[in-house]
Amino acid sequence: MTDVARILKEARDQGRMTALDYANQLFDDFMELHGDRHFADDGAVVGGIGYLDDIAVTMVGIQKGSHLQDNLFRNFGQPHPEGYRKALRLMKQAEKFGRPIITFINTAGAYPGVGAEERGQGEAIARNLFEMSDLKVPIIAIIIGEGGSGGALALAVADQVWMLENAIYAVLSPEGFASILWKDGSRATEAAELMKITAKELKRMTVIDRIIPERGYFSSEIVEMIKEHLKTEINQLRSLPLEELLENRYQRFRNF
C-alpha cells in the first residue's frame, strides 16, 4: 500500500475522533447549540460554545457517525443547507460577542440530494464563503479527516487552516476524479497521487498552515497538542488590528 493510499484509508476510518470528540476534550463547559432558525437542525453539522482554558470560543464542526444508526442521523457527514446555515448563525453570533471561531472539518462533501438543492445548497455554501471572509474575529479551521470539495471549504475560510497528518483535502474524491479522467473509479489511488491531497503536499504548496502529527501519538496527546497550538495562535491573531486580520485572511486566499 502506498503512503497516499494509507492516508486515504486512515482519513476515512470510522474510528477517527469526531468533531464532538474534539469539542468535548478541548473545551471546558462545552454547550452544543442547535438549529438554523429557518428550516431544521442538521445532524451533520454540530456547534456550540465553550472555554479554551480562559478563552470563550465558538466551535463548529462537521460530524460523522461512529456506527450505522449514528451515521444515518449524521447523513454520513454530508451537510444539508440547513447545516451550513446553522454554522453561519453560530459564527455570526461569535462575531457579535467577540469569540474566536474554531471549525473541525470531516466530510466527503455537501449532500447532493434533490431536497438539498431545492433548499439552496449552493447558495448556503456560497453565503458561508462570503460571510466568513469578513467575520471580525479570528478563525482557525482544522481538517480532522476528509476535507471534500466546497462542502469542506464552507467551513474553511479561515485565518489559518490546519490538517491532521492523516487527513486529506481535495476538490473532489479520488474516486470521482478517476471516474471523470479515466471513466474508472477503481483507479482512485492513482488519482489521489496526482491530486496532491495529503497534508504534507498541501503544506508544501502553502494551502494549509500547520500539520498536526498523529503517528506515534495517543489521541489524548494529539488533543493536548492542538490545544496548545490553538491558545498560542488565537492570542496572536487577537493581538492584530482588525484591518490587518481581515486583510491577511483576504490575501491568504487571493494568493492561491
UniProtKB/Swiss-Prot annotation:
GO molecular function: acetyl-CoA carboxylase activity; ATP binding; carboxyl- or carbamoyltransferase activity
TM spans (from-to): none
EC code(s) of this entry: 2.1.3.15
Compartments reported by the entry: Cytoplasm
Span of domain CoA carboxyltransferase C-terminal: 1-236
Keyword hit for Nucleotide-binding: yes
Pfam family for this entry, one: ACCA
GO biological process: fatty acid biosynthetic process; malonyl-CoA biosynthetic process
Catalytic activity: N(6)-carboxybiotinyl-L-lysyl-[protein] + acetyl-CoA = N(6)-biotinyl-L-lysyl-[protein] + malonyl-CoA
Listed GO CC annotations: acetyl-CoA carboxylase complex
Keyword Lipid biosynthesis carried by entry: yes
Biological or metabolic pathway of the protein: Lipid metabolism; malonyl-CoA biosynthesis; malonyl-CoA from acetyl-CoA: step 1/1
Predominant location: cytoplasm
Protein family according to the UniProt entry: Belongs to the AccA family.
HAMAP family, sorted: AcetylCoA_CT_alpha (MF_00823)
Subunit structure: Acetyl-CoA carboxylase is a heterohexamer composed of biotin carboxyl carrier protein (AccB), biotin carboxylase (AccC) and two subunits each of ACCase subunit alpha (AccA) and ACCase subunit beta (AccD).
Protein name, as recorded: Acetyl-coenzyme A carboxylase carboxyl transferase subunit alpha
Protein source organism: Streptococcus uberis (strain ATCC BAA-854 / 0140J)
Name of the gene this protein is made from: accA
